[in-house]
Structures are given as C-alpha cells and as structure tokens.
Amino acid sequence: IAETGAGQHGVATAAACALLGLECIVYMGAVDCERQKLNCFRMTEMGAKVVPVQSGSRTLKDAVNEALRDWVTNIRTTHYIIGSAVGPHPFPDIVRDLQSVIGNEARAQMLNQTSGEHGHVTFSNGPGRLPDVVVACVGGGSNAIGMFTAFLGDTHPSKEPAQGHVRIVGVEAGGEHGPWLPDGTETDKHAATLTNGVVGVLHGSRTFLLQTADGQIKETHSISAGLDYPGVGPQHAQLKASGRVEYKFATDSQALDAQRLVSRKEGILPALEPSHAMHTTMELAKTMRPDQIVLVNLCGRGDKDMLHVAKARG
C-alpha cells in the first residue's frame, strides 16, 4: 500500500507492483484525486486500486491517516511504502536515505561541471565548486531532505569557515496569501508549517505542525497537492530548530508565475510543487553576484498539473 498527494509516488508504487505481480492499493485524498486525474488514471492502468479518501480535508494528511490505519490493521500481510519523510521511525530515515541519491548525484555533477570549461562557461581548473545556495520545495519534505542531506556538512570552499556553510533554503506552500494577510492578520489558507507552525505530534513523529490551541489539526490550502500537508518531516523540524536550513514560502500565484516563466524561458514544464522553489530561487538570485551558483531541485514535471493550472488561470 501507499499514500500519495501529487500522485507521483502512487504511480511509482503501482509500476513496481505491476512488475512484481503484487496487489497495490493507493490512498489519495478525494480533492487530490480530482486535481491529479492524470496520475489516478496512470495508477489504475497499471492495475492499482486508488482509494479516494473522503474524511477530513480530503488531502494528503487524510491519505496518510488511512494508509496507516490499513497498515496497522493488516501488518502481517501488508507493506507500507510511505511517500514522504513523515510518520513514525524508521520511515523518515528510510525515505531520507533512499532520496539521498538526488543530493549525492547533484553534488557530484556540480563538482564535475564546475571544474574546467563546460559549454560557454570557464571555471577554475581546480577541483570543482559547491553551490552557494541549495533550494528545494518542502511539503512532507522527501525531495528536500534527499537534496539537502548531501550538503549539510559542507563549508563553501570560497568562504572562511567562520562565514558559514553552503546556504540551504526550503520553500513551503504559502497558499493564497501566505500565513498572514497584507494587514498582518493570520489566515489558514496556506501550508507553511515551518514558517507558522508549532511543535506537536502528527502521524507518529514530533515535529512542527499547524494546529489549534486545543491541539486539533488545521485544514491547509495549497494549489499544489504535494505541498498541501499540515506537518513536515521531523528531520526538517530539527534543521529549522538548529538554524542550519532556512525555510521560506511562496504563494499560489507566485508558483503559477514561476511555472510559466520557467516553461517559456527554459522549455521545461515544472510541477506546481517545485514551482514554489523556483519563485524563491529567482528572488534569491536578485541578491547574488553573477559568478555565484544556485542549485534548485526541480523535483517533478508539470504534465499532471495542466488541467488544474488551466482552471486556476481561468
């Protein structure tokens, strides 16, 4: 079994089960089923059973709830392939270690591409350079922890040790306005857990989450299904608490603008999730020198979002 928000993890699980001849059940919030119809169809075409979750906010949190209920009820016959760096131990560690291929490969490629001459850019003939900034979007946090892990212990070679490490930035879903309206009033139309959350327990881990004073989980909002989650992986909570990683947010409209700009300038159609990271990347770039390097994790393709984006654009 698996849970999924954006649907990509569900598709991967369905593909693996089809190859191995295993029964596959994927839990997905009913709202996400509607806005990710393409991935739902891909899963069912590979033989998976997609279960729309109708409880709660009908998004990723509720899909995780149902998957965990299934798993603990049928633990002797069921294996839960969790889709993010959330949940009880050892799930966050398992996901981090498997996703670390993202950061390890990116780090190796960065060092290779910045040694000598590549294309129209000539770098020093020495050993390659690490990026000045690493950026990724954060919902539950799987793609981000996979990217960040490879750089957590690095000090940039162009800096003195006292000046700090490679800068790492996670970008959450700011929803309609971010956690606050223009007049400073708080709003719940977002999923910026690390920006505006408090410490609590969700899905078996102690982390930052969006909850009321009575401890009830708040409903969240994001145009991107994969970031629409009221908690975050506990490793990100620790990285925020330690100050090693900065966490920012981008709103729905900023993500839509970034998606269109990347599509038209690069010929790459990014998913809505990494489009949040792209917005922040472009804002950071305005403050940097031309010779500095930003590494951004474009963790998903936008095909799955096109119907949803078309509706949002009117």
What are these regions (language model features)?
Residues 1-16, 20-29, 117, 124, ...:
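A short, small-residue-rich loop immediately preceding and capping a beta-strand
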Residues 1-9, 56, 99, 135-140, ...:
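Active-site nucleophile and cofactor-binding loops and adjacent substrate-binding regions
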Residues 9-66, 180-196, 305-312:
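Active-site-proximal loop->helix
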Residues 11-23, 148-156, 279-289:
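Alpha-helix C-terminal capping segments
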Residues 28, 54, 81-85, 136-139, ...:
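Short beta-strand segments
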Residues 61-96, 113-119, 123, 127-128, ...:
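Active-site/ligand-binding loops adjacent to catalytic centers
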Residues 101-113, 283-284:
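Phosphate/ATP-binding catalytic cores across multiple sugar-kinase/actin-like superfamilies
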Residues 138-142, 146, 252-313:
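Claisen-condensing/thiolase-fold acyl-transfer catalytic domains that form or cleave C-C bonds
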